[in-house]
């Protein structure tokens, strides 16, 4: 028998610019501040939570490869709480929410947190030949951010997907523009009413 699921709180950080004021802040630090704020807003104690689902598609710091555990510990969640990392390109935040909901629905968790973060400003460069030495030729720095944007199969940028789908399925521009306008109008209404501002942790 599945359990009823309720959302107790929601919070987000401010959106930063690429190379902006947040560029020197490790992703797990920013994420843990947001999770702590979410716990506080929920009215529950950090010790009450038994699971954290965390998603990031582009690990940017040495402690972000298992971000769920690191963020959970930095946020004051119990050491024996579950920690699950989700890696899904596009809609990963929604996938984290679904995974946390499944934990509760199946009775495996009582209180769970779904969280995620991307810090593209901190994406590293890699020298893949440096570990065993470069016998000859040039060493090349690989921009790991580039691989966060590209499809690993076609090597196309994921932003090109819209054009590809339009060509394949014959989508028309007008309905998409209407949908985009509706989204912008909703965003403006959320900003003007203060709803969005109340969600942001300074």
Feature locations, PLM:
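Short polar catalytic/cofactor-binding loops
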Residues: 10-15
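Short glycine-rich or small-residue beta-strand-to-loop segments that form or flank ligand, phosphate
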Residues: 52-56
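Acyl-thioester C-C bond-transforming condensing/cleaving domain
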Residues: 2-3, 17-48, 58-67, 72-202
């Amino acid at each position: 028998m599945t359990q009823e699921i309720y959302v107790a709180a929601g919070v987000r950080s401010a959106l930063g610019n690429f190379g902006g004021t947040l560029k020197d802040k490790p992703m797990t630090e920013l994420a843990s501040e947001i999770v702590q704020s979410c716990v506080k807003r929920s009215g529950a104690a950090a010790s009450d939570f038994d699971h954290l689902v965390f998603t990031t598609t582009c690990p940017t710091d040495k402690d972000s490869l298992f971000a769920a555990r690191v963020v959970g510990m930095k946020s004051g969640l119990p050491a024996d709480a579950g920690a699950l990392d989700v890696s899904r390109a596009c809609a990963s935040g929604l996938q984290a929410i679904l995974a946390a909901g499944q934990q509760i629905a199946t009775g495996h968790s009582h209180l769970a947190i779904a969280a995620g973060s991307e810090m593209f400003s901190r994406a590293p460069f890699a020298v893949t030949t440096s570990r065993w030495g470069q016998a000859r030729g040039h060493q090349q720095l690989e921009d790991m951010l580039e691989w966060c944007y590209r499809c690993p199969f076609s090597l196309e940028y994921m932003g090109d997907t819209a054009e590809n789908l339009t060509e394949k399925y014959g989508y028309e521009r007008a309905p998409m523009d209407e949908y985009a306008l509706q989204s912008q109008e909703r965003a403006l209404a959320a900003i003007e009413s203060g709803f969005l501002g109340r969600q942001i942790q300074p």
